[in-house]
């Protein structure tokens, strides 16, 4: 059997092929379907190792279509790089390392997200970009009108245009901000369409629908969590999910000294951000159905350690609850969070 290491790049990639006779063949090709097919399409079935990256999924599917066995490897798995030169890094060396790791099995396969969840992630990324862009426009418009002694009343982003229209701004000032207002109108419409699509996902997807029963977890956060985790069964417990989302403290230990720092911030940034935002929302609301136990728990932490620490702790708690709901096929039950209830520990 042939073993192939493929070091993927955005525009070009390095290929290292070890034939059945032990000969090494090295090529540099463009990261395009035609080039991959031309080089590897006529070769006998081989095992190909590539690192998880932006391009890895479509490349893996294309190579599998050519009859090869493709492994997408976790780039953080240290033994895969045991043969790598520590001070010299080149694409050719990386491809050789991947080829050798493929031959001896020194790799850990990364989880390959389903097509459905990959498309949902793309929708979430587009929505997030639109929301952030709208926030920049709001900030800029606010700064422009303040320079002229005007102030836009506070309120939701979605109703910002109505608040601006209600102001009797001078003609020259309205002319200056008109291009931004026009762009914001288009953004509002597109964000509304994106939200409608997410609402439909919640209605049609039983898992996301259950996740959305947790206080503070709306359609966007529930969908992002489901799209990031993909399969609850691939995790051994809530602790592993928290670590996967970068919500656990970094640990720097040596000998008898143990030190824990800030959260690791590993994994999907979008899902982690949304969970922390959900925690902040719970901390700030006065009352809500089923949210009192969670908010009370976080408020006690805030009193001792501050609100920022409490928000992250609550995000960790929410992560555990969401995972337990998915794993057990349940819906949120605030009674499980009452003091003395052992199942609450399992859920969180």
PLM regions and their residue ranges:
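Short glycine-rich, Thr/Ser-proximal phosphate-binding strand/loop in the N-terminal lobe
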Residues: 12-35
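Short, basic/hydrophobic alpha-helical segments
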Residues: 32-47
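Basic, amphipathic alpha-helical segments enriched in Lys/Arg and hydrophobic/aromatic residues
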Residues: 301-348
């Amino acid at each position: 059997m042939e073993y192939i290491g493929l070091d993927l790049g955005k525009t070009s990639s390095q290929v290292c092929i070890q034939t059945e006779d032990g000969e090494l063949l090295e090529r540099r090709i463009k990261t395009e379907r035609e080039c991959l097919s031309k080089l590897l399409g006529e070769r006998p079935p081989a095992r190909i190792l590539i690192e998880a990256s932006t391009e890895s999924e479509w490349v893996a599917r294309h190579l599998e279509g050519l009859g090869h066995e493709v492994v997408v490897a976790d780039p953080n798995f240290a033994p895969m790089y045991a043969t790598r030169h520590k001070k010299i890094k080149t694409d050719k060396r990386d491809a050789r390392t991947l080829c050798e790791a493929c031959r001896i099995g020194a790799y850990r396969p990364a989880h390959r997200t389903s097509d459905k969840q990959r498309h949902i992630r793309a929708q979430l990324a587009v929505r997030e970009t639109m929301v952030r862009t709208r926030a920049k426009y709001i900030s800029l418009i606010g700064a422009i009108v303040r320079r002229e002694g005007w102030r836009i009343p506070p309120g939701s982003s979605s109703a910002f245009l109505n608040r601006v229209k209600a102001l009797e701004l001078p003609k020259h000032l309205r002319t200056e901000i008109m291009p931004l207002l026009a762009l914001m109108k288009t953004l509002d419409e597109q964000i509304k369409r994106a939200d409608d699509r997410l609402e439909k996902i919640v209605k049609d997807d039983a898992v996301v629908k259950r996740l959305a029963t947790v206080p503070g977890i709306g359609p966007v956060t529930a969908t992002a969590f489901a799209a990031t985790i993909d399969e609850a069964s691939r995790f051994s417990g809530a602790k592993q999910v928290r670590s996967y989302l970068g919500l656990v403290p970094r640990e720097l230990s040596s000998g008898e000294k143990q030190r824990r720092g800030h959260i690791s911030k590993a994994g999907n940034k979008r899902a982690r951000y949304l969970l922390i935002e959900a925690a902040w929302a719970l901390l700030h609301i006065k009352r809500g159905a089923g949210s009192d136990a969670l908010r009370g728990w976080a408020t006690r932490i805030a009193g001792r350690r501050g609100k920022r620490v409490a928000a992250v702790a609550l995000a960790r708690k929410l992560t555990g609850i969401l995972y337990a709901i998915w794993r057990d096929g349940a819906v949120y039950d605030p009674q499980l969070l009452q003091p003395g209830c052992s199942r609450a520990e399992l859920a969180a």
